[in-house]
């Protein structure tokens, strides 16, 4: 399957284990299926596809703390154990792995799989890996969804300087998307939720302003009402047909998410972002989703991994 993609690795069924103390099909490990041939995805039976992007090369290039390459498998391991409260069909399609600093190749191959799955009517729920997953994920969606907006829950804009032909990193994905949109003469629709004042330099705030980025700071989520926040999201998504939703776990406070490259002492709580995430899913406009920056070697008692899995489970159960 995907034999022409050198960095693709098939799913590992051993990751999907859990308690068997209740009726069949009540936990994710009992719901997951695997396929042997990509032609099995060319059917009318639409599925949610789990796809990992096992890379921390972008984090390394960004001078961060590595370990996120192990994130996808750990998220799958934790998700497997959780109860599943819906009747959706899930497929673990495996991972795209970044080897030997070949980030650009890995991103291209990840994008090809995303494109193939969406072209055949499936939805992607992807697990990073560093936030370099965002540029890979977007490339797989852009030609299929012309009026596509990006909503990023993140402490950082990830708009660090990037010029075409340079190597990107975990801090440049949305600069890369902006450059791509400019080249294609497409509007750049980008919204960032949970921005930390001291996680971004003044020049990054200036760049966000120049690119007309919509954003809410972490303070906005503490100080403003949920109704105000939802009105902000409504204004952003009003003229968009589709949304690519990406979650960087460092948007959350270090006490909840210690296992990330750049933990945030003044980050948000899970229940400050969950209502907004669920609202976006309920809008019907989210076509693809990922969660990034889990670094198992930096985690404490699986706190971040378990939280990542719970966030995914909550969103998969939201209609």
Curated annotation (Swiss-Prot):
<comment type="similarity">
    <text>Belongs to the arginase family.</text>
</comment>
<protein>
    <recommendedName>
        <fullName>Formimidoylglutamase</fullName>
        <ecNumber>3.5.3.8</ecNumber>
    </recommendedName>
</protein>
<dbReference type="GO" id="GO:0050415">
    <property type="term" value="F:formimidoylglutamase activity"/>
</dbReference>
<dbReference type="GO" id="GO:0019557">
    <property type="term" value="P:L-histidine catabolic process to glutamate and formate"/>
</dbReference>
<dbReference type="GO" id="GO:0033389">
    <property type="term" value="P:putrescine biosynthetic process from arginine, via agmatine"/>
</dbReference>
<feature type="binding site">
    <location>
        <position position="250"/>
    </location>
    <ligand>
        <name>Mn(2+) 2</name>
    </ligand>
</feature>
<feature type="binding site">
    <location>
        <position position="154"/>
    </location>
    <ligand>
        <name>Mn(2+) 2</name>
    </ligand>
</feature>
<dbReference type="InterPro" id="IPR005923">
    <property type="entry name" value="HutG"/>
</dbReference>
<feature type="binding site">
    <location>
        <position position="248"/>
    </location>
    <ligand>
        <name>Mn(2+) 1</name>
    </ligand>
</feature>
<feature type="binding site">
    <location>
        <position position="248"/>
    </location>
    <ligand>
        <name>Mn(2+) 2</name>
    </ligand>
</feature>
<dbReference type="GO" id="GO:0030145">
    <property type="term" value="F:manganese ion binding"/>
</dbReference>
<comment type="pathway">
    <text>Amino-acid degradation; L-histidine degradation into L-glutamate; L-glutamate from N-formimidoyl-L-glutamate (hydrolase route): step 1/1.</text>
</comment>
<dbReference type="InterPro" id="IPR023696">
    <property type="entry name" value="Ureohydrolase_dom_sf"/>
</dbReference>
<dbReference type="GO" id="GO:0008783">
    <property type="term" value="F:agmatinase activity"/>
</dbReference>
<keyword id="KW-0378">Hydrolase</keyword>
<comment type="function">
    <text>Catalyzes the conversion of N-formimidoyl-L-glutamate to L-glutamate and formamide.</text>
</comment>
<feature type="binding site">
    <location>
        <position position="156"/>
    </location>
    <ligand>
        <name>Mn(2+) 2</name>
    </ligand>
</feature>
<dbReference type="InterPro" id="IPR006035">
    <property type="entry name" value="Ureohydrolase"/>
</dbReference>
<feature type="binding site">
    <location>
        <position position="154"/>
    </location>
    <ligand>
        <name>Mn(2+) 1</name>
    </ligand>
</feature>
<keyword id="KW-0479">Metal-binding</keyword>
<keyword id="KW-0369">Histidine metabolism</keyword>
<feature type="binding site">
    <location>
        <position position="131"/>
    </location>
    <ligand>
        <name>Mn(2+) 1</name>
    </ligand>
</feature>
<keyword id="KW-0464">Manganese</keyword>
<feature type="binding site">
    <location>
        <position position="158"/>
    </location>
    <ligand>
        <name>Mn(2+) 1</name>
    </ligand>
</feature>
<dbReference type="Pfam" id="PF00491">
    <property type="entry name" value="Arginase"/>
</dbReference>
<dbReference type="GO" id="GO:0019556">
    <property type="term" value="P:L-histidine catabolic process to glutamate and formamide"/>
</dbReference>
